[in-house]
Amino acid sequence: MDLDDKDRTIITMYADDPDISQERIAQAIKLSQPSVAARVSRLRKAGALEKSVGISPLKMGLYLAKVDLASNEPDAILHMFRSCPYFANGFSVSGRHNLCLFFFSESVATLESIVNGHIRSNPSVKEVDFNIVITTERDFVVPARLRSERVEEPPCGMKGDCRRCPSFLEKKCMGCPATGQYQGSFYQP
């Protein structure tokens, strides 16, 4: 997609203030509001202007984990976490590690339990690097689903009952909010 200076200004103004009015943008780039609306529509259809609503884990006092790993089944790993309430996002990447995953929780021990119980224990995983994010330069927004329908089976596909897991019993893991087997406070009503 070719962007002109007005398109770049529109994108920048939305990046600086997602709630900015099209009227203000129109004044800044010297176009009518309907012309701005048409440009915004075109930019959105092309994927040049996206909106993401969610939570900022670090601002909320939650822990954010970055997990780099090497797996010979990266798509299966991504699929396993797709509906996990703790999963922020995942990326297929080049280099020694072929996946970069982000998770958030109110507990570092829960993040460690996810990594140890679902990633390190996975036979397709060859190497894992687990880190806690301390700060971000830009706001890191996660489109979190804090209210989801209860499910019988954990979204990660884990077999068994969280309540019987040693990490859960020792309060090292908060459990799975999706199944109701959860002992934390963040997802509680």
Task: Report the location of each language-model feature.
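A compositional/biophysical signature of low hydrophobicity enriched in polar/charged and small residues
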Residues: 1-189
